[in-house]
């Protein structure tokens, strides 16, 4: 096994993105494990790894990885949204709603706002 260089890690990260796009979360995880081991502080790699766990229906590892990203980047709207989806799939709807609402507050993308399920405005009395 050869040593991981910055170049090979970038190649592995890009290949993992391609594998995830091709719906191969296991293949992506194999590559991302190397990248995260070499650079545990890299939130982009951790976010991609969390997505791979989610797509592979490994909800607990996905949750932990999304939480790690949010500890480092508490204003990452996508990470809040994805953690919300993960919790929703695990049938933890109240926890999910909190993260959906944080995502929508940070970035009012339609899918974030829709997931947040805000109460409709009340008509004036």
Which positions does each model-derived feature cover?
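TPR/TPR-like (Sel1-like) alpha-helical repeat modules
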Residues: 77, 81, 85-112
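Alpha-helical segment of the N-proximal tetratricopeptide repeat
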Residues: 6-38
């Amino acid at each position: 096994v050869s040593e991981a260089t910055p170049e090979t890690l970038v190649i592995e990260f890009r290949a993992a993105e391609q594998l995830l796009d091709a719906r191969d979360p296991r293949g992506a995880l194999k590559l991302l494990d190397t990248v995260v081991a070499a650079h545990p502080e890299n939130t982009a790699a951790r976010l991609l790894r969390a997505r791979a766990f989610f797509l592979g229906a490994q909800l607990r590892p996905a949750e932990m990885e999304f939480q790690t990203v949010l500890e480092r980047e508490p204003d990452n709207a996508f990470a809040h949204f994805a953690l919300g989806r993960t919790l929703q799939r695990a049938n933890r709807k109240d926890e999910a709603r909190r993260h959906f609402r944080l995502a929508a507050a940070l970035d009012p993308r339609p899918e974030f706002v829709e997931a947040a399920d805000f109460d409709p405005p009340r008509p004036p009395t």
